[in-house]
């Protein structure tokens, strides 16, 4: 029975298969002298397939503690799809053939993520395994919203009545909501036409979206800051936008993406990063490519 090594752990290849057979069929490991060398992910993958056994009964638990359940599930799914998979510095990279590897970060439900990670350390996919072991995959991409609405400078008095803001005078059609001859304004709209574009991060994002030619309405009923239409002819909002604090629990991010997916919209997380409004689109995907 041929054998191999994974760190300090010795394993044996089952069913009379050779080391070269394992390397050729599963595209994992390499030879060093007479031994097949595997990393912990590769070793566990072959163990669960019944291709190897361990010399020491404690080896399985030791290796599983090294990789964690969540990362192993991601690895196994990718391997079963025929990818070459490697873990490096906490990220999983995968590819077929010689193309550029795609990247994946595993997130637990209650992990925290910083907006700076989304823009400075981007990955192609996020992968989460819930408490019942079911995986969910999200694609991630920085985007630059580009609406079709021709924007001209807007400035008008704002009147407070009944605890709400109303626009006085002629306003552009895309600002406010008609109410018995008045124009009811959201707080962001009121700040915008008052010239107070930097009252808060939310106001800064609102102003930036308007400047990009987008039509911006409240996203409250979807649990977001805004729903965004790219043009007057849009039948439905293309985006939901939430202004993200410096750090957020992954559970909250995932919940927003799920809501957007259920109403066929793209979830965008926005924040002010290095004095610039940045946008990252996250989508729930049924399957990795």
Curated annotation (Swiss-Prot):
Q: Report the sequence similarity comment from the record.
A: Belongs to the tRNA-intron endonuclease family. Archaeal long subfamily.
- What Pfam families would the database entry show? EndA_linker, tRNA_int_endo
GO cellular component terms attached to this protein's record? cytoplasm
Q: What is this protein called?
A: tRNA-splicing endonuclease
User: What Enzyme Commission number(s) apply to this enzyme?
Assistant: 4.6.1.16
Catalytic residues, per the record, are 229, 236, 265
Which molecular-function annotations from GO does this UniProt entry contain?
lyase activity; nucleic acid binding; tRNA-intron endonuclease activity
Record bears the keyword Phosphoprotein = no
């Amino acid at each position: 029975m041929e054998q191999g090594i994974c760190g300090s752990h010795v394993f044996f290849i089952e069913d009379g298969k050779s080391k070269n057979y394992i390397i050729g069929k599963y595209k994992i490991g390499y030879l060093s002298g007479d031994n097949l060398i595997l990393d912990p992910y590769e070793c566990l993958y072959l163990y669960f397939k019944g291709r190897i056994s361990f010399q020491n009964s404690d080896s399985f638990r030791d290796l599983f503690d090294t990789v964690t359940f969540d990362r192993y599930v991601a690895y196994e799914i990718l391997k079963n799809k025929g990818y070459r998979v490697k873990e490096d510095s906490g990220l999983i990279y995968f590819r077929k053939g010689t193309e550029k590897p795609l990247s994946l970060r595993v997130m637990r439900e209650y992990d925290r993520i910083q907006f700076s990670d989304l823009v400075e350390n981007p990955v192609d996919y996020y992968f989460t395994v819930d408490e019942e072991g079911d995986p969910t995959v999200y694609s991630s991409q920085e985007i630059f919203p580009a609406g079709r609405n021709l924007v001209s400078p807007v400035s008008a008095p704002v009147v407070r009545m009944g605890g709400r803001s109303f626009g006085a005078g002629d306003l552009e059609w895309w600002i406010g909501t008609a109410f018995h001859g008045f124009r009811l304004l959201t707080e962001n709209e009121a700040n915008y036409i008052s010239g107070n574009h930097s009252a808060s991060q939310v106001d800064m994002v609102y102003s930036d979206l308007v400047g990009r030619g987008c039509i911006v309405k409240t996203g409250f009923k979807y649990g977001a800051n805004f729903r965004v239409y790219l043009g007057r002819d849009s039948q439905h909002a293309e985006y939901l936008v939430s202004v993200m604090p410096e750090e957020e629990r992954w559970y909250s991010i995932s919940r927003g993406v799920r809501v957007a997916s259920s109403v066929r919209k793209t979830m965008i997380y926005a924040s002010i990063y290095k004095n610039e409004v940045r946008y990252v689109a996250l989508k729930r995907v049924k399957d990795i490519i």
